[in-house]
Amino acid sequence: MNKISRKGFLKIAAAAAMSGVTAGALAACESASSAASSAVSSGAGSVAAGATYIPGTYEGTAQGISSTVKVTMTFSETAVTDVVVDTSGETASYGAAAADELRQQLLEAGSAEIDGVSGSTITSDAVMKAAQSCYAQAKGEAVVTSVQLPSGDENDWLGTEPDIDEAAITETWDTDIVIVGAGNGGMCAAAYAAQKGLNFRIIEQNSAVMETRHWYGTIDSSEAQKQGVPPVDRAELLSEISRSMGGRCDQRVVKTWIDESAAMHDFVAGILESAPYNYTCNLTLGDEAKWPDDTQISQTKLMFPVQQVDYSSAEKPRNVVFQEYIESLGYAVDFHTGLAKLEKDGDGRITGLIAQNTEDGHFIRINASQGVLLACGGYAGNPYMMEKLDPLGTSVTTACSYAPADKGYGIRAAIWAGAHLDAEAAPVLFDRGLVAPGVDSGYVESASSFGGKAFPGTVGQYNPGSQPFLKVNRHGERFMNESQEYDNASHASFQQPGHVYAMIHDANFREDVDRFHTIGCSALTRYIPGMMESQLEQYEAEGLIMKADTIEELADKMGFAGADKDTFIATVQRYNELYDAQKDEDFGKPASRLSAIRTAPFYGCWLGASLLCSLQGISITPNCQAKDDRNEPIPGLYVTGDMSGSFFQNNYPCVMGGTACGRTLTFAIKAIKQMAGLE
C-alpha cells in the first residue's frame, strides 16, 4: 500500500528544507504531478546587497501534457541572461513546437508570468511553473517539489491504491454528484446536470477543459429528420456493431446509444444552436456517407448509417461552450484538482473520492451522496498499460494523435475500487503514422516522455495515408487489398517486416483521390483544396515523403535495394496491369480504388498506425453503472467515455463515423439521469 500521510509530507518538507525545497503537489486522474521540481546547476548562497538574484544557472521541471518539461535559466545579479526551454517530449505539432516562442516570452517578460502559446495551454503552464522554480532558486527562496501518486511501471501497470492518512486530508466538500474529468463526457454531463439544477462538482487535474472531439454519432436525430434522411434500420445497425466486435459487446449497452443518442443531440443542439452562440449543425449525409457502389459489390457489405453531426466550424469548441454554459448557471470546473482514490462504505457503495489540489498539494475529501461519474479518458498515453494490455496495437503504431494526458489513472482507480476491466484491447488506429525510411513501429526510448518511451513519428496523422493507393512491404511486395477500414491496414502490417509498409502513387493523385471517394475523416484529403499538395511539399522537405522522376529512383530513395528493389519495380508494373484491366485479380480491390503509377513525379512514404485513443474500459451496465468481477453493478459508480467498456472490443468500426464520441455524450447524460433519479 502506498501510504501518504501528514507525517510523511512533513518529513519530505523537513528534508527538502535543508536544500531550500518544500513539499508539494501530487498527480491525478490522467497525468503526473504538475508541480515544479528543481535542481541548481550552479550558483549558491544568498542575494548580495543591491542585487536581485544570486548569479548562476538554475533548472526547473514540471509535468506537461505528456512529458517532463524542463526550463534552464541563467541569471546575473540583476537580470536573466539566457533561457533554454525543453518541451521535446510534448505533442510534436503543439507543445514541442512551442519551445522557441516560450523561450522568447520568458526572456522578454523578466518573470515567469508569460502569455503562453495558444493551443498549448498545459505545456505553457508547465513552462511557467518550471520558470517559477528557477526564479525562486535565483532569489534564494524555497521551491516546490513534487510527490507523485503511483504511476505503475513496466512490470506492474496497475500499481497499488494509495493509502492516504486522515490527517493529510485538510478539506471536505459535500455534494450529490462528482464528475471526474472535464473532457467530452465530463463536460456534457456537467452541462446536463447544470441545466437540471443539480448539486454537483466537476474536477479536472489540468488547467483547462480537454480537447473537443467535434464529430459525434446520433441515430435518427432531429437534424437527420429535418434533412429528410430515412430512419436507420436499428436492428441491422445493432447486428453490424455486434459482428464488428465479434459478438463480445453487451448489445444492451450498444442499444443505449442507439435509442438515446437522438435525445442527446437535441440537448447539445439546444445549447450550441441557441443564443449567444447560434452555431450551425453539419450533418454528414448523401454521397459523403456512402462509399462508391462497387465497394459494396466487391467486398462484404458494410453499413454506413447517416449518423455523424458536428459543429466543427463553430467559433468555440463544444467543451468550451459547455464550460461557459455551466458558469452562466453558477457552476464552475474545479481545475487543478485530481482524483487520488475512490472511497466506499462497508457495503461496497462508492461514497465519493479523495482528490488533491495539484498546485499546493492539499488533499480534499469529496462526499457524493448520489454517485461518482468517471470520465477520465483511456490509457493511450501510458506505455506501461499499452504494452501489457494492447501488445498488438502498440507493436504496429508509429505515431500518436491521442490526448497525451490520457494515462489510465481513472481506470486504475476504478479497478482498485473493485471494478472490472474488459478483457480485450480496443485501440482506435488510423493508417496515417508517417515515418522516415528504416523506422520500425513500436516504442522508442524517450527520456522526457512518461514511462521513458514514445512512438517515433513526428506527425500526428498524415491524412492521405488512408487513401487506397498501392501499399507494399519492405521487400517490395503487395500484401493486401488497400481499400479497407482505417485499422485494417495497420493490423495487416503486423505480419510484415518492421510492422510498416510503403504507400506509392504518381502525379495524378488528385484525380485518384476524387475517384476513390473515401468517407469520414479521410475525406479531408479530397475536399480540402490543396491539402495533399501542401503536405507532400512539407513532408518531402522533412525527409518523410520521397519524390522521384523514375520508379527506379523512387525505389532507391525509399530504401529498396537488391532483390527487394527488383520486386518493388515488378510490383508497380503488375499494379499498372491490374489498373488497365480494371480488375484486381490479386486481392479483389474494387476497380474504383485502383490507380495507375505512370506519370512523374512519383511519390512514396512509409506508414504505420497513428494511435488516437484506447477504448478498452470498465465494464458497465446499460445504465452506465460500473460492474465488478462478478458482473454485478457497483452502487454509486458510473463511467462514460473512452474509459467505459462493454461496447468496443478488438477494434473501432470506423465506417460508422462518430460512434465513440456519440456514445460518450449519450452515456454522460444517461449516468447523470441515473444518479439524480431523473428516470
Q: Which residue stretches match the model-derived regions?
A:
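N-terminal secretory signal peptides and thylakoid transit peptides that target proteins
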Residues: 1-20, 24-28
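Active-site- and interface-proximal helix/loop "cap" or "latch" segments in soluble metabolic
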Residues: 48-149
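Beta1/beta-strand and adjacent pyrophosphate-binding region of the FAD-binding site
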Residues: 168-183
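Glycine-rich FAD pyrophosphate-binding loop
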Residues: 195-212
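Conserved redox-cofactor binding core of oxidoreductases
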Residues: 259-362, 383-384, 443-446, 578-599
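Glycine-rich loop(s) and the adjacent beta-strand/alpha-helix scaffold that form part
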Residues: 359-361, 367-439, 655-657, 661-670
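An anion/pyrophosphate-binding glycine-rich loop and adjacent beta-alpha core
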Residues: 411-413, 420-560
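A glycine-rich dinucleotide-binding beta-alpha-beta segment and adjacent secondary-structure elements
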Residues: 566-651
